[in-house]
Amino acid sequence: MDVRFISLTKPEIVIDGEPLSPEGLIAYCARVSSPNQENPNYTKLLQFCIREGHWSIFEMVDMTLEITTTRAIAPQILRHRSFSFQEFSLRYSCATEYECYEARRQDVKNRQNSLDDFDESTKKWFNQAQAAVWEKSHQLYEEALAKGIAKECARSILPLNTVTRLYMKGSVRSWIHYFSVRCDQATQKEHREIALAARKIFMKHFPTVAAALEW
């Protein structure tokens, strides 16, 4: 798993000799009907909009991240339809690696939860099982390609823990909603770790918004 910052909306507006920050652009657009639109102070404004649920202003700025994950987790991410995505395609490129999942026990009281309480021998068995499945499936995948079978067909042999990469672009509003859902304990651990890493990047670029959300 890896999350990498790619891009952020860059305002071209300059106020009092200083370029407007992405957060400043949110406030600038929020004040579209105000004669005080170029007010450089926006902390209280953003706090107010978050507190009162005026979310539309947070659609004025986008952030793009690169996410490296697996074919098991990618569909969960792609389910967030307010984002725009570009994903690594196994129709055109070859699979080269897999991600080893840790063995966790199913929580019988909560189907959305799993428990990290297996003994080391069970964890070792699960790691070895994943390695064996990858080795065999990747061998057959390579054989299929060597026989001239199209990548779009050969990829069906590969397991769900095959590594993939995608770009995820969304507005600040979309990211806020994504974090509220996917940083929660109800989210699968592997996906939650991605969301937490993404939120850490978000907090760096939107400190005022993050503080208002009490992150």
From Swiss-Prot:
Its cofactor is FAD. Residues 1-215 form the ThyX domain. Its EC number is 2.1.1.148. GO terms for biological process: dTMP biosynthetic process; dTTP biosynthetic process; methylation. InterPro entries: Thymidylate_synthase_ThyX, Thymidylate_synthase_ThyX_sf. FAD binds at S56, R79, H80, R81, E87, H177. PROSITE patterns: THYX. Keywords: FAD, Flavoprotein, Methyltransferase, NADP, Nucleotide biosynthesis, Transferase. The active site is at R182 (involved in ionization of n3 of dump, leading to its activation). GO terms for molecular function: flavin adenine dinucleotide binding; NADPH binding; thymidylate synthase (FAD) activity; thymidylate synthase activity. Pathway: Pyrimidine metabolism; dTTP biosynthesis. The keyword Plastid does not apply. It catalyses: dUMP + (6R)-5,10-methylene-5,6,7,8-tetrahydrofolate + NADPH + H(+) = dTMP + (6S)-5,6,7,8-tetrahydrofolate + NADP(+). DUMP binds at Q76, I77, L78, R79, E87, F88, S89, L90, R91, R155, R182. Pfam families: Thy1. A motif (ThyX motif) lies at residues 79-89. It comes from the Bacteria. Binds 4 FAD per tetramer. Each FAD binding site is formed by three monomers. Catalyzes the reductive methylation of 2'-deoxyuridine-5'-monophosphate (dUMP) to 2'-deoxythymidine-5'-monophosphate (dTMP) while utilizing 5,10-methylenetetrahydrofolate (mTHF) as the methyl donor, and NADPH and FADH(2) as the reductant. Homotetramer. Belongs to the thymidylate synthase ThyX family. PANTHER family: FLAVIN-DEPENDENT THYMIDYLATE SYNTHASE. This is Flavin-dependent thymidylate synthase. It comes from Synechocystis sp. (strain ATCC 27184 / PCC 6803 / Kazusa).
